[in-house]
């Protein structure tokens, strides 16, 4: 009954996350709701064999962070905290929870503005947006009374994990960046090996006023089939757990709710998906005692040179780059066993 009450609480918190004509229009055109998202998440987590606790962690301004906790009464070990990427949610770690939580507490949460966390209105300034994300992570940590943590972030989560570590270094025992977004600067057109075609630049300019995933919401009742057509790979990645469309349904319902975190992300970017405030310009200021591990997929289309760049910016600090063979951008789902093993090895260097 207690878990059910917690889930009911978060539904009411989500409902207050956005307002206006768009929020009212979305459920009518898009076959989704907070209840649909809750059901989709429960299907994702149904195959996780270990026990866990889930609840909304209250932070400031009436917001809450939807959280999964795998404790196993191992309070002496430094907890591992997982931050998902853009357009994702905590459910996407389903292939990793059991293995990663065998000998230490593991926490995963939906970033503010994503998944089942509150969806507030973010600032339009990139620096302020970043700070809002960072402060939400710090308030979450304080609410759970975690002293220090091993902070792991994928994609946008990697960028935010680095930003948090810069501001609150005393709380981070090890920073693990998994295919992080937002590190390099946007290259000059003259420096690019393959210049961006004119039609792509024109399309990018035309879509500038819109959020990155606006097409899903515009597609309305056809949005789910759109996800299934555009990203059939997600079904394959999780085929060991699910034979149906559980994963694509979860991704769909995560991304057709009020676009709070999505708008925040857009305000942090410049065409074509580059960060306004690249992390490589600042990562050299990270406290020298914080070890950094960078994990990337050997088959990823994302620039895998960030680890080398971080190493050159922190010559006297621990920086290790790890390539996962056979993995693309979604390393943790492409090669979960290898990914889990590497992360556990990193964690064992802490305690």
From Swiss-Prot:
MF-aspect GO terms: 1-acylglycerol-3-phosphate O-acyltransferase activity; carboxylic ester hydrolase activity; lipase activator activity; lysophosphatidic acid acyltransferase activity
GO biological process: one example: negative regulation of triglyceride storage
Q: Where is the AB hydrolase-1 domain?
A: 79-184
Q: How does it assemble?
A: Interacts with ADRP and PLIN. Interacts with PNPLA2. Interacts with PLIN5; promotes interaction with PNPLA2.
Activity modulation comment: Acyltransferase activity is inhibited by detergents such as Triton X-100 and 3-[(3-cholamidopropyl)dimethylammonio]-1-propanesulfonate (CHAPS). Acyltransferase activity is inhibited by the presence of magnesium and calcium.
Induction of its expression: Increased in the early stage of adipocyte differentiation.
Which InterPro entries does the UniProt record give? Answer: AB_hydrolase_1, AB_hydrolase_fold
**Chain's gene name:** Abhd5
Compartment(s) of residence: Cytoplasm; Lipid droplet
**Where is it predominantly found?**
cytoplasm
Q: Which reaction does it catalyse?
A: a 1-acyl-sn-glycero-3-phosphate + an acyl-CoA = a 1,2-diacyl-sn-glycero-3-phosphate + CoA; 1-(9Z-octadecenoyl)-sn-glycero-3-phosphate + (9Z)-octadecenoyl-CoA = 1,2-di-(9Z-octadecenoyl)-sn-glycero-3-phosphate + CoA; 1-(9Z-octadecenoyl)-sn-glycero-3-phosphate + hexadecanoyl-CoA = 1-(9Z)-octadecenoyl-2-hexadecanoyl-sn-glycero-3-phosphate + CoA; 1-(9Z-octadecenoyl)-sn-glycero-3-phosphate + octadecanoyl-CoA = 1-(9Z-octadecenoyl)-2-octadecanoyl-sn-glycero-3-phosphate + CoA
Tell me the function of this protein.
Coenzyme A-dependent lysophosphatidic acid acyltransferase that catalyzes the transfer of an acyl group on a lysophosphatidic acid. Functions preferentially with 1-oleoyl-lysophosphatidic acid followed by 1-palmitoyl-lysophosphatidic acid, 1-stearoyl-lysophosphatidic acid and 1-arachidonoyl-lysophosphatidic acid as lipid acceptor. Functions preferentially with arachidonoyl-CoA followed by oleoyl-CoA as acyl group donors. Functions in phosphatidic acid biosynthesis. May regulate the cellular storage of triacylglycerol through activation of the phospholipase PNPLA2.
Q: What class of enzyme is it?
A: transferase
Motif location (HXXXXD motif)?
329-334
What name is this protein filed under? 1-acylglycerol-3-phosphate O-acyltransferase ABHD5
**Swiss-Prot/TrEMBL domain comment:** The HXXXXD motif is essential for acyltransferase activity and may constitute the binding site for the phosphate moiety of the glycerol-3-phosphate.
Keyword vocabulary terms for this entry: Acyltransferase, Cytoplasm, Differentiation, Fatty acid metabolism, Lipid biosynthesis, Lipid droplet, Lipid metabolism, Phospholipid biosynthesis, Phospholipid metabolism, Phosphoprotein, Transferase
Signal peptide positions are none
- Identify one Gene Ontology CC term for this UniProt entry: lipid droplet
Residues annotated as carrying Phosphoserine in the record are: 124
């Amino acid at each position: 009954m207690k878990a059910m009450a917690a889930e009911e609480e978060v539904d009411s918190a989500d409902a207050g996350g956005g307002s206006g004509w768009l929020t009212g229009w979305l459920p009518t055109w898009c076959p989704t709701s907070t209840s649909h998202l809750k059901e989709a998440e429960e299907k994702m987590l149904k195959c996780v064999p270990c026990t866990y606790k889930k609840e909304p962690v209250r932070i400031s301004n009436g917001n809450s962070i939807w959280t999964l906790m795998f404790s196993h009464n191992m309070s002496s070990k430094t907890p591992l905290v997982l931050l998902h990427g853009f357009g994702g949610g905590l459910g996407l770690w389903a292939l990793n929870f059991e293995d990663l939580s065998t000998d230490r507490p593991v926490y995963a949460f939906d970033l503010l503005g994503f998944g089942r966390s509150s969806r507030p209105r973010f600032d339009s300034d990139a620096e302020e947006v970043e700070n809002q994300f960072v402060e939400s992570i710090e308030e979450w940590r304080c609410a759970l009374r975690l002293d220090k943590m091993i902070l792991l972030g994928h994609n946008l989560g990697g960028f935010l994990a680095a930003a948090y570590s810069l501001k609150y270094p005393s709380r981070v025992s090890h920073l693990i960046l998994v295919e992080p977004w937002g590190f390099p600067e946007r290259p000059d057109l003259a420096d690019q090996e393959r210049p961006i075609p004119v039609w792509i630049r024109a399309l990018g300019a035309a879509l500038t006023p819109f959020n990155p995933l606006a097409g899903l919401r515009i597609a309305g009742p056809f949005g789910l089939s759109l996800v299934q057509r555009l990203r059939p790979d997600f079904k394959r990645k999780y085929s060991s757990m699910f034979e149906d469309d559980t994963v694509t349904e979860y991704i769909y319902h995560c991304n057709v709710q009020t676009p709070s975190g999505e708008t925040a992300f857009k305000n942090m970017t410049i065409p074509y998906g580059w960060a306004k405030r690249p992390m490589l310009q600042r990562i050299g200021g990270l406290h020298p005692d914080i070890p950094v591990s960078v994990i990337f997929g050997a088959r990823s289309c994302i620039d895998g040179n960030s680890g080398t760049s971080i190493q050159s910016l922190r010559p006297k600090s621990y920086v290790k780059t790890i390539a996962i063979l056979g993995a693309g951008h979604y390393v943790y789902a492409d090669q979960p066993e290898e990914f889990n093993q590497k992360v556990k090895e990193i964690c064992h260097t802490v305690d």
